[in-house]
Curated annotation (Swiss-Prot):
SUPFAM superfamilies, sorted: Prokaryotic ribosomal protein L17
Entry protein name: Large ribosomal subunit protein bL17
Lineage of the organism: Bacteria, Pseudomonadati, Pseudomonadota, Gammaproteobacteria, Legionellales
Quaternary structure and interacting proteins, as annotated: Part of the 50S ribosomal subunit. Contacts protein L32.
Similarity-based family: Belongs to the bacterial ribosomal protein bL17 family.
HAMAP family: Ribosomal_bL17
Bilayer-spanning residue ranges: none
GO MF entries: structural constituent of ribosome
InterPro entries per record: Ribosomal_bL17 (IPR000456), Ribosomal_bL17_CS (IPR047859), Ribosomal_bL17_sf (IPR036373)
Gene behind the chain: rplQ
Domain of life, per lineage: Bacteria
UniProt keyword Secreted present: no
Gene Ontology cellular-component terms listed: cytosolic large ribosomal subunit
Organism whose genome encodes this protein: Legionella pneumophila subsp. pneumophila (strain Philadelphia 1 / ATCC 33152 / DSM 7513)
Keywords: Ribonucleoprotein, Ribosomal protein
Length: 127
């Protein structure tokens, strides 16, 4: 019985789930926009929002806490040098989830996850 167990299992073991969300966090930090299924996007908030909050105060302890989740030096570097100062004045709500239809093949609901206040590149203006 799964009484009072929060979060979704996604039919994965806990280590697989931890690795999946760690990789998704790294991809979101690196690219600032990813496309995934809607349930995964909603659960990704539980991982990325506290990471960005930790990155607002740049200390050795907070960098180690972020590295414990991300396991990527480049992602931790960008998180603390770029994203932390960018979201310093924002009290929360660092990501935006936009529904974007259904996936071909299995009709899974898809979503785009992007960081708020993302700088607009020239590729985005052409669309």
């Amino acid at each position: 019985m799964r009484h009072r167990n929060s979060g979704r299992s996604f039919s994965r073991t806990s280590s697989h789930r931890k690795a999946m969300f760690s990789n998704m966090c790294c991809s979101l930090i690196e690219h600032e926009l990813i496309r995934t299924t809607l349930p995964k996007a909603k659960d990704l908030r539980r991982y990325i929002e506290p990471l960005i909050t930790v990155s607002k105060s740049d200390s050795v302890a907070s960098r180690r806490r972020a590295f414990d989740i991300l396991r990527s030096k480049s992602a931790v570097g960008k998180l603390f040098t770029d994203l932390g100062p960018r979201f310093a004045k924002r009290p929360g709500g660092y990501i935006r989830i936009i529904k974007c239809g259904y996936r071909d093949g299995d009709n899974a609901p898809m979503a785009i996850v992007e960081l708020m206040d993302r700088p607009v590149s020239s590729d985005d203006t052409e669309e």
